[in-house]
Each structure stands twice: as structure tokens, then as C-alpha cells.
Amino acid sequence: MKPLTARQQEVFDLIKAKIDDTGMPPTRAEIARELGFRSANAAEEHLKALARKQVIEIIPGASRGIRILLQDADHHDEELGVPLIGQVAAGEPILAQEHVESHYKVDPGMFKPQADFLLRVNGESMKDIGIMDGDLLAVHKTQDVRDGQVVVARVDDDVTVKRLERKGSMVFLHAENEEFSPIEVDLTSQSLSIEGLAVGVIRSTTWM
């Protein structure tokens, strides 16, 4: 990624500060006023330059349509917060940039072990242990997991959250809801990879 000019860095820092302070990015007019540009159009040109350098994403049709990308110039990921993973494309790494919906200002160290990413829960298969549809599941990225732990697993190209049980060449991914049967994986004919260990839950209504 190309380095930012001094002016572009000012614009970027202002965007980040506004999001940190208010939870929302600034409008073009606010950027122009804060940084002394003659017009909102001048601010727009700087935003386009930042988008070309893949520091931000411009969302069309919204006055505050600016999203900071995870990889952002000289700022470290931890400054942005924990990445929230949305839909995971088949065959792609779970932390691939295109999977990151946004990021949350939570301290990764509040979870043990620390959270490397958040995954939006889809469905009620784990509701009996308090993991509800729409919650944000805090996940520590690791393949070092034990039977009985709740893991994020990829079976072929599907990502799921279940309790792990291994028996020889068979793996059973158990739901925590009696309405759901275990997912059975035969390692002799199917692929399975562990994406991480569930380390906590953030109730979505608190954060959205």
C-alpha cells in the first residue's frame, strides 16, 4: 500500500477520531470545516485518494458513507478494534479482508484467551448455552482445541459453531439445542478445519 501524504493522513486521522468520539464518520462538509478546505468537494477528492490507497471504503449515497478498512496505512489492527466477520466465501481464509464487515472497540484481553475476531451468529443451534441468533461470538484463532470445547469449524466450505467431539476418523459437531442433530464428519472423505475457539459472547443489542 502506498504511503499517505501528510494531508491524507490528517483526513484519515479526523475520520478515525470522529468514529471513536461519536460512533459515526464525519460528513464531507464537516471534514472541510475541520481541516480548512474551501469546499466539501475538496474533502471528497481526499476521500477518493484514501479509497484508492485502500485505507477507507466510500459507501455511495450516504453523507457519512465512510468505512475504515482493517488494513489502514500505519495504524495497527488493534487500534481499530476487533474485526467482525460476516459471510465467509467458500475456500477463502476466515480473516480475509473481504469478510470483514466492520470492527468493534472492545478490549481483546477481556476474553481468555484473547479474542482475535468476532463472528456473527446465524441461527439457534447453540441457544441452550446462551449463544443466540444475531449475537457476536468472540473467537480466539487457534487449531489447538480439545474435545468438549465450542469451536468455529469449517466443514468442506461451510463455517459452523458447535461443540467438538472426536472419535478416530470421525468428528461430531454437537449443537446445544435438542432440535438439531450433530454434524458428522468422516475425515477419510470430508475436509474439516478448526478456525478458532469460542471465548465469549457479546449480545448484539448492546453493540448494534
Curated annotation (Swiss-Prot):
Example GO biological process: DNA replication
Annotated positions for site Cleavage: 90-91
Keywords on record: Autocatalytic cleavage, DNA damage, DNA repair, DNA replication, DNA-binding, Hydrolase, Repressor, SOS response, Transcription, Transcription regulation
A GO molecular-function annotation: DNA binding
Start-end of DNA-binding region: 28-48
Keyword DNA repair attributed: yes
Keyword Transcription regulation recorded: yes
Active site: 125 (for autocatalytic cleavage activity), 162 (for autocatalytic cleavage activity)
Cross-referenced InterPro entries: LexA, LexA-like, LexA/Signal_pep-like_sf, LexA_DNA-bd_dom, LexA_repressor, Peptidase_S24_LexA, Peptidase_S24_S26A/B/C, WH-like_DNA-bd_sf
Catalysed reaction, written as an equation: Hydrolysis of Ala-|-Gly bond in repressor LexA
EC number: 3.4.21.88
Known function: Represses a number of genes involved in the response to DNA damage (SOS response), including recA and lexA. In the presence of single-stranded DNA, RecA interacts with LexA causing an autocatalytic cleavage which disrupts the DNA-binding part of LexA, leading to derepression of the SOS regulon and eventually DNA repair.
Subunit comment: Homodimer.
Stored HAMAP family: LexA
Similarity-based family: Belongs to the peptidase S24 family.
Protein name, entry field: LexA repressor
Gene name of this polypeptide: lexA
